[in-house]
C-alpha cells in the first residue's frame, strides 16, 4: 500500500497545486476510501475562476466515488466490507441543528464547505484527493455503473430533491430552462414522472441532446419568446412546473411568465451575481402560484440516486464528456 496520498489544492484564483500528504490512519469510527473518480462541478469551476470566494488554501471536490480499502474497528461489518464500491456524500450537514433533526439536512443551518476534514492537509470537501477518511453515515453502495458515471450520484440527488419539491404529476407540462447537466437531469427525471417537457436554451447542441433524451419541445429564447411558445403548446394554460437551472437573475424573472395558475416555479441554481428580481405580488395572489427554492440534497435523496443509477433507471453516459488523470488537472479546469 502506498504511504503518500495526493490532493488538488486551490491556492488562489486560477491557481491549483498537486500536493502529497501522508495517507491518514483509520480512526475507530471511520473508513478509508481510495477515490476512483471525482467530477468537476460548476461550484469548483467558480472557485477556480474566483467567482465563488473561499479561504485559501482549499481542497475542492464533492462528487466522488471510490472503494473502501480499510475500516475502523467500530464500523459495522454487516453493512460494509473492504472492496465495496461507494458514492461519498460530503455536503457536510451538521446533523444536529433543527433542520437536520427535522429531516431537512439539505438546509442545514451550519452547512460549511470549508470544514477541516480528518486526515486532509487543508480545509475543504476533499473529493479531489486520492484518499479520504469518511464516516459510514456518508457512504452509499452503488453498482453496475462505471466510476465516471457514478460521480453523477451527487448532482442527481440534488436534482431528485428539486423534482420532488416541485410535486410533478402525470400529464403536467414542465419547462426546464437551461440545458447544462443539471437541466438535462431535470429533463430526465421529469419525463420519468410522466411530464411533457419543454426545454429552453440558446445552445442548440444542448437542446438537441435534450430532445434525444426525451424532451417533447425545444425553444431557443434568442430566437423565440419562451412565454408565447409555452402558451402555444399548452393552449394558453402555461406550465404546471418551471425549473430555472441558470445562475442569471433576469432569466428567473422572465421564467415567472411561463407559470400556469396554481403552478410552481423552482429556482435550482445559485445566482451570480445575486441581483434582486421583480415579481408582481398581485399576480402571485391571484394565480396561487408557488415560488420554491431548492439546494443540496439529503440522505434519502442520495439513497434514491444510487438506486436510480444502479438499477439503470437513469442513464448518465451522455453526461461524461471528458476523463482526466489527477495529474492533468490544469487541462481539466481550463
What are these regions (language model features)?
Residues 2-7, 253-257, 299-334:
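C-terminal hydrophobic helical "lid"/dimerization subdomain
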Residues 24-38, 51-101, 143-145:
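Glycine-rich beta-strand-centered segment in the early N-terminal region that forms part
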Residues 79-81, 168, 259:
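Short, well-ordered loop/turn sites that connect or cap secondary structure elements
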Residues 85, 173, 241, 263-264, ...:
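Short glycine-centered segments of the SAM/dcSAM-binding site in methyltransferase folds
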Residues 96-177:
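NAD(P)H dinucleotide-binding glycine-rich loop of Rossmann-like/cofactor-binding domains
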Residues 144-224, 228:
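Mid-domain Rossmann-like dinucleotide-binding core that forms the NAD(H)/NADP(H) cofactor-binding site
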Residues 233-241:
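A glycine-rich helix->loop->beta "capping" turn
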Residues 249-311:
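Glycine-rich phosphate-binding loop and adjacent beta-alpha segment
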Amino acid at each position: 500500500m502506498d504511504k503518500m496520498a495526493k490532493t488538488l489544492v486551490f491556492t488562489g484564483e486560477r491557481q491549483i497545486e498537486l500536493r502529497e500528504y501522508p495517507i491518514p490512519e483509520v480512526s475507530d469510527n471511520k473508513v478509508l476510501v481510495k477515490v476512483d473518480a471525482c467530477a468537476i462541478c460548476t461550484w469548483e469551476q467558480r472557485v477556480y475562476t474566483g467567482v465563488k470566494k473561499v479561504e485559501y488554501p482549499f481542497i475542492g471536490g464533492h462528487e466522488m466515488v471510490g472503494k473502501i480499502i480499510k475500516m475502523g474497528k467500530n464500523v459495522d461489518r454487516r453493512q460494509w466490507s473492504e472492496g465495496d464500491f461507494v458514492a461519498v456524500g460530503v455536503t457536510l450537514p451538521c446533523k444536529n441543528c433543527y433542520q437536520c433533526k427535522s429531516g431537512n439536512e439539505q438546509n442545514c443551518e451550519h452547512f460549511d464547505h470549508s470544514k477541516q476534514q480528518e486526515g486532509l492537509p487543508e480545509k475543504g470537501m476533499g473529493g479531489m484527493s486520492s484518499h479520504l477518511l469518511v464516516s459510514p453515515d456518508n457512504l452509499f453502495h452503488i453498482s453496475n455503473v462505471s466510476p465516471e458515471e457514478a460521480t453523477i450520484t451527487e448532482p442527481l440527488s440534488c436534482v431528485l430533491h428539486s423534482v420532488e419539491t416541485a410535486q410533478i404529476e402525470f400529464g403536467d407540462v414542465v419547462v426546464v430552462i437551461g440545458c447544462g447537466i443539471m437541466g438535462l437531469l431535470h429533463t430526465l427525471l421529469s419525463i420519468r414522472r410522466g411530464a411533457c417537457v419543454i426545454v429552453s436554451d440558446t445552445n442548440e447542441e444542448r437542446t438537441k441532446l435534450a430532445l434525444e433524451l426525451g424532451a417533447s419541445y425545444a425553444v431557443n429564447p434568442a430566437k423565440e419568446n419562451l412565454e408565447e411558445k409555452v402558451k402555444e403548446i399548452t393552449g394558453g394554460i402555461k406550465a404546471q412546473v418551471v425549473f430555472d437551472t441558470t445562475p442569471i437573475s433576469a432569466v428567473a424573472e422572465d421564467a415567472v411568465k411561463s407559470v400556469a395558475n396554481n403552478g410552481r416555479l423552482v429556482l435550482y441554481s445559485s445566482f451570480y451575481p445575486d441581483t434582486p428580481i421583480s415579481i408582481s405580488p398581485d399576480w402571485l395572489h391571484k394565480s396561487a402560484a408557488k415560488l420554491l427554492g431548492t439546494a443540496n440534497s439529503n440522505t434519502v435523496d442520495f439513497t434514491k440516486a444510487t438506486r436510480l443509477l444502479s438499477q439503470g433507471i437513469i442513464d448518465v453516459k451522455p453526461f461524461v464528456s471528458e476523463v482526466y488523470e489527477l495529474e492533468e488537472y490544469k487541462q481539466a479546469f481550463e
